[in-house]
C-alpha cells in the first residue's frame, strides 16, 4: 500500500463502508454485490485481457467471448435480479461495452413494454437465452432525434397479412444501432406504419435479419458494420437496409396500437406510450452519468494523493498534488456532483418503476412529467458528467492522456450518451415544451403538481423581477433549504422570462414554430435551471433521510459545495434576478474555498466509498493500493511495439534511407 494513501485513509473522519451501504441501498445489497464480484474475480473462466493492446477485430471477438461466458455464468450463479445483473456487468465489462448489450437494455425492455402477452411468450425466452440476439433499430443515416422524420416504411398487405418493410432512400438506412453490424439476428425496427393508404406514424416491428444457425443475412436484408468510431471499439454499430422485406402481421408490437387482419388501425390510448423504451433508457442514463463520473473522480483523486509535484515553499518536500487549492477546486466540485447524480439516478430509477406500474393500471397522469424529466435530466447529467470526466483527465497531467490512466476509455465510452437516446439540446427543448405547458396552466389558474409545483407561485408578484423588496434579503449559504429555495427562484425566473419571450415573438404575428426557434436559447437556459434545481432539491431531500449524523455531516458538506459552486458558476443569473446581491456572491465564493479545505481530509475516503474494484476502473493511476509508478512501467512493457527490440519498419524504410545519406 502506498504510504500516502494509507495516511489519507487513516485521517478520514468517517467510515466509508457506511456510505457504500447508502449508495447500494442497504448493507445486504453491498454484501450481495461483493459476493457476486468475488465470484467473478475468482473464476478462471473470466480472463481479463487488456483491451488497450488489441486490434478492433480482436476487441470485438474478446467482447463476444466475454458476453457468451457472462450469460452462461449468470445462469450458473442464479443471477436474474436487474440490480445484480448490473453489478455483474459493471465488474466484468469495466469501461468497455458489449455487442449483445442492446439485447438486454433495449430489445427485451421494448418487448416487455410494447409486446402483447402472446408476443412476449414467443420472443422473450429465446432472447434472454441469446437464441434470439436483438437490437433496437431506430436511428437512420438522415434522422436521429427527430423521430417524425424517420423514413423507413412498413406497409400492410391484407392479402398476405404481412408488413412490407422498406428503406426507400439512402438516408432511410438504419445507422448506428449497437450489435447490428455483426452480432444481432433480430432487430426491433421503428418504421412509419402505412395501412389502407394512410400513414399512422412510427411503430415498432420485430424484424429477423439473419438466419438462425448460419447467421447469414436474410434475402432482402443488407446489413454490416459502420466502421471505426471515437470509441466503442468492441461494439459493432451497424447499418441496415431493407428492400421489400416481408414480415408477418404478428411481428408488429401490438400491446397498445394494433392492425387488424383486414388492415384496420386501432390507435393507442396515448401516443407517448410507444416512447416507453426511450424513457426507460433515459431514466437509467442519469445513473450511468453518476457511475462514469465517479469512476473518473476516483482515479483523479487517488492519483492526486499519490503524485508529488512542485513546491509550495522553496526547499521543502514536494507536496501531494491534492494539497494544491487549484487541484481541489478542479476535483472536489466534480466529486460533489458525482454524489448528487448518484442520488438523482436512484430517484429516477425508482420513479420510472413506480410510474410504469401506474401506466400498467391505466393511469397516464404522470407520464408527461416523467417524459419531460427523463429528457431534461438525461441532457443535464450527461453534459455535466462528460465535461467532468475530461476535467479529471486533465487533472492527472500528462499521464491522464495515456490509456493506462483509464480515463480516456471512460470518456470515449460515455461521451456518446450526449447524443444517443436523444441529442441533448433537443432533449432540453422537449422539457422546455413541457415547462411552457405547465406555465400556461398556472397562468390560467390551475394548480400543478410534482417537481414543477414551485411554478404555482408564479402568479404572485413574488418572482417578478421588478418586485425586489419581496425577495429574501438574507440567504443562509449554509442552509440546504435556503439554497434549494434560491435555485427554485432562479428556475422560476428563467422559465417566466422564456415564456414571456415566446409570447412576445408570437405577438409579432410569428407562428408558434418560428417563435419557438427564435427563443430556443432562452428555453434551453430555463430547462437547465429547472434541472439544476431538481438535482439540488433531490440531494437536499436525501440528506434528510440519512440517520447517521457523521455521514450526514460529510455529505452535507458535499451538498453545500455542489450548490454553492453552481451559484458561483451561474452568478449572473442570481444577480440579474435580484435573487442574491454582489456581496452574497462574494460570500459564496469564499465559502466554496473554505469547503475545499473541509473536504480535503475525506477526499480519498469519499471515492473509496464508491467501492470500485481495480478491474472496474481499468486504471494504473487510480489503483486502490496507490502503487502507480511500478505498475506504469510494467504496463508500458506490454505494448505490442515492444515485442521486438528493432521494429521491422526500421529495416524496410529507415535503414535504406540512412544508407543513401
From Swiss-Prot:
Residues the UniProt record annotates as site (Cleavage): 468-469
Localization per Swiss-Prot or TrEMBL: Peroxisome
Residues the record lists as N6-acetyllysine modifications: 65, 216, 255, 267, 272, 437, 446, 500, 512, 637, 652
UniProt xrefs under SUPFAM superfamilies: Acyl-CoA dehydrogenase C-terminal domain-like, Acyl-CoA dehydrogenase NM domain-like
UniProt modified residues of type Phosphoserine: 26, 649
Active site: 421
Motif placement: Microbody targeting signal: 659-661
Similarity field: Belongs to the acyl-CoA oxidase family.
Subunit structure, as described in the record: Homodimer. Interacts with LONP2.
Protein name as catalogued: Peroxisomal acyl-coenzyme A oxidase 1
Gene name of this polypeptide: ACOX1
Amino acid at each position: 500500500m502506498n504510504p500516502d494513501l494509507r495516511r489519507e485513509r487513516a485521517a478520514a473522519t468517517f467510515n466509508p463502508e457506511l456510505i457504500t451501504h447508502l449508495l447500494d441501498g442497504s448493507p445486504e445489497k453491498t454484501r450481495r454485490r461483493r459476493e457476486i464480484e468475488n465470484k467473478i474475480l475468482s473464476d478462471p473462466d473470466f480472463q481479463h485481457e487488456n483491451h488497450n493492446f488489441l486490434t478492433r477485430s480482436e476487441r470485438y471477438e474478446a467482447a463476444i467471448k466475454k458476453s457468451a461466458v457472462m450469460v452462461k455464468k449468470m445462469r450458473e450463479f442464479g443471477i436474474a435480479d436487474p440490480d445484480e445483473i448490473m453489478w455483474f456487468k459493471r465488474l466484468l465489462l469495466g469501461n468497455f461495452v458489449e455487442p449483445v448489450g442492446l439485447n438486454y437494455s433495449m430489445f427485451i425492455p421494448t418487448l416487455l413494454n410494447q409486446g402483447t402477452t402472446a408476443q412476449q411468450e414467443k420472443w422473450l425466452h429465446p432472447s434472454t437465452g441469446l437464441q434470439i440476439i436483438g437490437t433496437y433499430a431506430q436511428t437512420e443515416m438522415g434522422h436521429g432525434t427527430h423521430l417524425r422524420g424517420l423514413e423507413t416504411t412498413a406497409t400492410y398487405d391484407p392479402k398476405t397479412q404481412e408488413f412490407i418493410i422498406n428503406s426507400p432512400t439512402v438516408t432511410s438506412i438504419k445507422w448506428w444501432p449497437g450489435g447490428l453490424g455483426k452480432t444481432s439476428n433480430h432487430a426491433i425496427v421503428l418504421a412509419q406504419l402505412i395501412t389502407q393508404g394512410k400513414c399512422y406514424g412510427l411503430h415498432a416491428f420485430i424484424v429477423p435479419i439473419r438466419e438462425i444457425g448460419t447467421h447469414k443475412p436474410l434475402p432482402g436484408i443488407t446489413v454490416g458494420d459502420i466502421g471505426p468510431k471515437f470509441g466503442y471499439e468492441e461494439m459493432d454499430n451497424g447499418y441496415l437496409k431493407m428492400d421489400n422485406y416481408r414480415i408477418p402481421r404478428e411481428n408488429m408490437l401490438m400491446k397498445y396500437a394494433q392492425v387488424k387482419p383486414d388492415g384496420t388501425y386501432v390507435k393507442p390510448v396515448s401516443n407517448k406510450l410507444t416512447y416507453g423504451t426511450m424513457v426507460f433508457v433515459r431514466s437509467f442514463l442519469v445513473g450511468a452519468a453518476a457511475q462514469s463520473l465517479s469512476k473518473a473522480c476516483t482515479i483523479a483523486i487517488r492519483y492526486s494523493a499519490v503524485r508529488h509535484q512542485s513546491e509550495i515553499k522553496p526547499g521543502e518536500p514536494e507536496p501531494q498534488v491534492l494539497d494544491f487549492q487549484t487541484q481541489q477546486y478542479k476535483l472536489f466540485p466534480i466529486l460533489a456532483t458525482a454524489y448528487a447524480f448518484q442520488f438523482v439516478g436512484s430517484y429516477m430509477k425508482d420513479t420510472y418503476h413506480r410510474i410504469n406500474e401506474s401506466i400498467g393500471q391505466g393511469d397516464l397522469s404522470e407520464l408527461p412529467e416523467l417524459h419531460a424529466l427523463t429528457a431534461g435530466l438525461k441532457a443535464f447529467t450527461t453534459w455535466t458528467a462528460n465535461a467532468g470526466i475530461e476535467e479529471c483527465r486533465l487533472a492527472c497531467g500528462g499521464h491522464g492522456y495515456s490509456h493506462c490512466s483509464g480515463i480516456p476509455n471512460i470518456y470515449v465510452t460515455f461521451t456518446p450518451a450526449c447524443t444517443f437516446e436523444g441529442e441533448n439540446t433537443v432533449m432540453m427543448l422537449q422539457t422546455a415544451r413541457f415547462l411552457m405547458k405547465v406555465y400556461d396552466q398556472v397562468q390560467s389558474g390551475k394548480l400543478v403538481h410534482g417537481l414543477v409545483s414551485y411554478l404555482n407561485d408564479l402568479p404572485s408578484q413574488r418572482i417578478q423581477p421588478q418586485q425586489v423588496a419581496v425577495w429574501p434579503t438574507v440567504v443562509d449559504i449554509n442552509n440546504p433549504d435556503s439554497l434549494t429555495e434560491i435555485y427554485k427562484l432562479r428556475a422560476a425566473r428563467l422559465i417566466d422570462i422564456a415564456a414571456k419571450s415566446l409570447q412576445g415573438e408570437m405577438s409579432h404575428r410569428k407562428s408558434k414554430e418560428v417563435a419557438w426557434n427564435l427563443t430556443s436559447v432562452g428555453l434551453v437556459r430555463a430547462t437547465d435551471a429547472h434541472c439544476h434545481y431538481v438535482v439540488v432539491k433531490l440531494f437536499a431531500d436525501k440528506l434528510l433521510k440519512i440517520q447517521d449524523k457523521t455521514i450526514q455531516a460529510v455529505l452535507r458538506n458535499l451538498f453545500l459545495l455542489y450548490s454553492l459552486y453552481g451559484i458561483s458558476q451561474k452568478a449572473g443569473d442570481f444577480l440579474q434576478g435580484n435573487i442574491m446581491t454582489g456581496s452574497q456572491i462574494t460570500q459564496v465564493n469564499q465559502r466554496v474555498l473554505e469547503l475545499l479545505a473541509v473536504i480535503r481530509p475525506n477526499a480519498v475516503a469519499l471515492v473509496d466509498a464508491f467501492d470500485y474494484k481495480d478491474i472496474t476502473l481499468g486504471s494504473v493511476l487510480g489503483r486502490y493500493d496507490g502503487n502507480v509508478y511500478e505498475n506504469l512501467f510494467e504496463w508500458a512493457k506490454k505494448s505490442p511495439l515492444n515485442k521486438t527490440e528493432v521494429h521491422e519498419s526500421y529495416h524496410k524504410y529507415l535503414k535504406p534511407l540512412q544508407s543513401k545519406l
